[in-house]
Amino acid sequence: WQDLPRTNGTDKDIEKFEVKYGDMLFCRSSLVAEGIGKASIVPEDVPQNTLFECHVIRLPLDLSKCVPEYMQVFSTMEYFRRQIIAQSKTATMTTIGQDGILKADILLPPMSKQREFYAFVHQVNKSKFDTMTFAPIYDIINLYLHTHFYQGRR
């Protein structure tokens, strides 16, 4: 946090642009289509008065329906990435608006499964993810999503 750029935000700026745990931040523009809409969650330990800026789209998550750490991983899955790239526009740079992100279908397992997944992720390592470590749980989530959503068993 110490290396982040600093600014003198007004109370109005802080009210409008402050991020909190449960916010997802999406890349609004990229030189390549694959970079568009890449997302990160705001971690629980975010310092007070941390603001986002205009090159980022902020979407607050409903914490009664989803676990942010689950959504972080979901945002990297091919199912979600294809939808985001399909909603983007390319001229000199590839861009996407908040409306494009909101058009994506979000597949949410029950909160208990999301929490179970988060507990696993948290136990392995809170900040550095090893793809090979997550392969089994990633496969389980994909199987669940396929069984319950793709085959119409909502």
Give short role names for the model-derived ranges.
Residues 1-24, 30, 41:
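Sequence-specific dsDNA recognition surfaces
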Residues 130-154:
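Short amphipathic coiled-coil heptad-repeat segments
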Residues 67-71, 102-139:
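Amphipathic alpha-helical segments
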Residues 48-57, 66, 88-115:
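A short glycine-rich beta-alpha junction/loop motif
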Residues 62-64, 68-79:
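Glycine- and charge-enriched low-complexity intrinsically disordered segments
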Residues 21, 38, 103-105:
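Extracellular/lumenal ectodomain signal focusing on beta-strand-rich modules
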